């Protein structure tokens, strides 16, 4: 038991959230560099400047499917063992991105300091709110001209509704960027750009009133002292309890491209971020230091190579210890399975897992029996909660080139929806099939997989659907009346749950006003 507790206490499991182009890929790489997880030789190719260097296993090669190793990286740092879960950006954005956030204990939010809070960040923060996930903030790109730091923090507070506590404070920006003042340590760290894989030795001046500071940065020292008077008066002090409740975020400034400030973030995560947390189930709360193994599946990644129908189910370990060859109980189907070939992810290598502890992520080979949200135990029958389906944001009607294959199409879509690749809706009043997704890439993936795995050729057509909501009502009679009057807007999803398909947001809002007893839900438990 005590061995387990030691391992649990070491773990920190977090994800990085940001708007595309805020620097997430760079920061992921630099976090691995500071964690010594990025091997210096053989893994980096890029222009001589190193600016475009990208480790091979982070290149998302769509033509052969996204390499599984992009998803989980584990490395030691400061006496802890850090699990970093990547959330795909850009067009790879999908429901997976949202669901990954249900498997972590904290998040690092990266903001482009020239732009401030952007819409993708707002959406991702809404998801972290479902579980009050603690958030660490990094204001990136200080080597460029940025917006006023106090304005940036005000925007985070107002738009994202979370208090900000600055931990480091920038001295200048762009060409005049001199470094940061670490408020809690009362020290100035001078900026020296370390590009690519060079981590410069820290130049630190102890104390804001140290005369050496004036020698090093001239008039910027006096400006910093004045500014700190203002900042101390106007901003929040760091409060660990408020951070753990998701009410306050510690804010760091730096430049990931210049390898500066990343170590401050990692120090903060190791010192303050929660170790693996207890998890709710439908019967009780599962504590991480329990002896028996438990875990849940939050993501299924299909290998898009048709020769290998290898799908990997990503499982977050919640309690106990995974050992190679152990027997697990797959609760939903009521079967025991022997797991001898689970994968672990150490610095981008796909290795067979010898063991794994709470907070770790392991990959199970899945031949179609595992679904998102599935719980695995050592025999106990319960289901972990908190792995939701999210209302899609994009919709297409899907149509067959060969109308005789309707049955295969429906079967394929239902199976893909169980896996979480896409959501499917069957309107009550028509024979249409509507596919819903969070990101464009999901549509492409589905057509490709229908063809390779189900031998079905399908095409998409536009459809005037703006959003979807799952519909619930405690009063069976009122639900039946609603179903009768609004049938032209109702559909069943892949799991036969009643769903309201709204052509416009105005239509949805009117229906919500007209039927106050009906709940229109944005998320649904798996």
Curated annotation (Swiss-Prot):
The keyword Transmembrane helix does not apply. Keywords: Cytoplasm, GTP-binding, Nucleotide-binding, Protein biosynthesis. GTP binds at residues 18-25, 86-90, 140-143. It is found in: Cytoplasm. One of its GO terms (cellular component) is cytosol. Residues 9-277 form the tr-type G domain. It comes from the Bacteria. Pfam families: EF-G_D2 (PF22042), GTP_EFTU (PF00009), RF3_C (PF16658). Signal peptide: none annotated. One of its GO terms (biological process) is regulation of translational termination. InterPro entries: EF-G-like_DII, EFG_III/V, G_TR_CS, P-loop_NTPase, PrfC, RF3_C, RF3_dom_3_sf, RF3_GTP-bd. One of its GO terms (molecular function) is translation release factor activity, codon specific. Belongs to the TRAFAC class translation factor GTPase superfamily. Classic translation factor GTPase family. PrfC subfamily. Increases the formation of ribosomal termination complexes and stimulates activities of RF-1 and RF-2. It binds guanine nucleotides and has strong preference for UGA stop codons. It may interact directly with the ribosome. The stimulation of RF-1 and RF-2 is significantly reduced by GTP and GDP, but not by GMP. This is Peptide chain release factor 3. It comes from Shewanella putrefaciens (strain CN-32 / ATCC BAA-453). The gene is prfC.
């Amino acid at each position: 038991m005590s061995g387990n507790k030691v391992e649990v206490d070491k773990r920190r499991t977090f994800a990085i959230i940001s708007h595309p182009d805020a620097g997430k890929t760079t920061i992921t790489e630099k976090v691995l560099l500071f964690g010594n997880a990025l091997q210096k030789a053989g893994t980096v190719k890029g222009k001589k400047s190193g600016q475009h260097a990208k480790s091979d296993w982070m290149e998302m090669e769509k033509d052969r499917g996204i390499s599984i190793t992009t998803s989980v990286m584990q490395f030691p740092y400061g006496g802890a063992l850090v699990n970093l879960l990547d959330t795909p950006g850009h067009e790879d954005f999908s429901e997976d991105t949202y669901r990954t956030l249900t498997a972590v204990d904290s998040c690092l939010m990266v903001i482009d300091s020239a732009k401030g809070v952007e819409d993708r960040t707002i959406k991702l923060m809404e998801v972290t709110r479902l579980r009050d996930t603690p958030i660490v903030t990094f204001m990136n790109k200080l080597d460029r001209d940025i917006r006023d730091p106090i304005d940036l923090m005000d925007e985070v507070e107002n738009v994202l509704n979370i208090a900000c506590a600055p931990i480091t404070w920038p001295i200048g920006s762009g060409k005049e960027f001199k470094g940061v003042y670490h408020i809690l340590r009362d020290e100035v760290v001078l900026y020296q750009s370390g590009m690519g894989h060079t981590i410069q030795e820290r130049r630190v001046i102890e104390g804001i009133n140290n005369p050496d500071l004036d020698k090093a940065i001239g008039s910027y020292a006096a400006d910093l002292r004045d500014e700190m008077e203002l900042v101390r008066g106007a901003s929040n002090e760091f409060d660990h309890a408020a951070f753990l409740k998701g009410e306050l975020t510690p804010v760091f400034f730096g430049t990931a491209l210049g390898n500066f400030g990343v170590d401050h973030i990692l120090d903060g995560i190791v010192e303050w971020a929660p170790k693996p947390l207890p998890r709710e189930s439908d019967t009780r709360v599962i504590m991480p230091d329990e002896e028996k193994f438990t875990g849940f599946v939050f993501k299924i990644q299909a290998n898009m190579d048709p020769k290998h129908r290898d799908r990997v189910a990503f499982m977050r370990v919640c309690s106990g210890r995974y050992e190679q060859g152990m027997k697990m109980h797959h609760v939903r189907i009521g079967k025991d399975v022997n797991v001898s070939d689970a994968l672990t992810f150490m610095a981008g290598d796909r290795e067979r897992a010898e063991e794994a502890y709470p907070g770790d992520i392991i990959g199970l080979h899945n031949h179609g029996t595992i679904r998102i949200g599935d719980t695995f135990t050592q025999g106990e029958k319960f289901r972990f909660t908190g792995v939701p389906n999210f209302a899609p944001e994009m919709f297409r009607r899907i149509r067959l080139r060969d109308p005789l294959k309707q049955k295969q199409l429906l079967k394929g879509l239902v199976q893909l929806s169980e896996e979480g690749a896409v959501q499917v809706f069957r309107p009550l009043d028509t024979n249409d099939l509507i596919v819903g997704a969070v990101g464009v890439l999901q549509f492409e993936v589905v057509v490709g997989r229908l063809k390779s795995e189900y031998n079905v050729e399908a095409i998409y057509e536009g459809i005037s659907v703006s959003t979807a909501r799952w519909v619930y009502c405690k009063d069976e009679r009122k639900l039946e009346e609603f179903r009768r009057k609004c049938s032209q807007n109702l559909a069943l999803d892949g799991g036969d749950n009643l769903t309201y398909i709204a052509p416009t947001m105005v239509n949805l809002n009117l229906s919500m006003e007209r039927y106050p007893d009906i709940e229109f839900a944005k998320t649904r438990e798996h």
